[in-house]
A protein has these predicted regions:
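Acidic, polar-rich low-complexity tracts and alpha-helical solenoid repeat scaffolds
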Residues: 1-225
């Protein structure tokens, strides 16, 4: 069964790489002023993200198996699996870096692309996941500043709030930004999480009564749902 699974995975990787190479060539042969170019680049970004996720999940699987081998006392197998994990993590990160490079090119050369707010959001989300918190904040704030009607506005305010809360530990600013998430779209998926984090802002600001009231409000809203 493992051999069949490995063969299927190998075939999937080959098909993925072939599709990426074909699209890379198509992008290269498309004129810079062709409206299709940023669309093709966005599609390439999606494919690179899928590639990254595949290898990241494989790396997680290797880690799980390595832990099992370690628990069973098979140190040699554990080290072998951990080496595979490291290799797949590297491939996954390289795919994300390539994706970010593409998105930066779209921003630089195709700033009038109709989906530019989406590109900025994807950039910011991946930057945050990869540890580029400051750059992620710049893109989130860019959405707020330049795309006031964007569907990604709640997520942009949430990304800014998370930076203010976690990195800057600036509770007053974080609280305001979480409040903006809720006011922009109370029904967004980001709003319920923002309401919860508002409770922690109040708690960290030394207002336990407000924090408790906020947490109770979150529970009531969850019960309604």
């Amino acid at each position: 069964d493992e051999m069949v699974a490995a063969s299927a995975a190998s075939e999937k990787i080959e098909l993925q790489q072939s599709a990426i190479k074909k699209l890379q060539l198509r992008i290269k042969n498309t004129d810079e002023d062709d409206p299709a170019k940023p669309q093709l680049m966005e599609r390439m970004g999606d494919m690179l993200w899928q590639k990254a996720r595949y290898y990241e999940l494989e790396a997680y699987d290797y880690l799980s198996k390595a832990n099992e081998a370690g628990a069973a006392g098979d140190t040699a197998k554990q080290q072998q699996l951990l080496a595979k994990k490291t290799e797949d993590e590297k491939i996954g990160r390289e795919a994300r870096e390539e994706m970010l490079k593409l998105y930066r090119e779209i921003l630089k050369y195709h700033s009038d692309y109709e989906q530019i707010d989406k590109i900025r959001y994807y950039m910011a989300f991946n930057m945050a996941e990869m540890g580029y918190a400051g750059e992620a904040y710049e893109q989130y704030s860019g959405i707020v500043r330049e795309h006031s009607n964007s569907r990604y506005l709640p997520e942009a305010f949430l990304g800014m709030a998370e930076y203010s809360f976690t990195i800057e530990e600036d509770m007053p600013t974080a609280l305001q930004q979480y409040q903006k998430v809720v006011s922009v779209d109370p029904n967004s998926s980001a709003a319920s999480y923002a309401m919860y984090k508002m409770g922690w802002c109040y708690f960290n600001l030394g207002e336990p009564k407000k924090a408790l009231a906020q947490f109770e409000k979150v529970i009531r809203e969850a019960d309604k749902g």
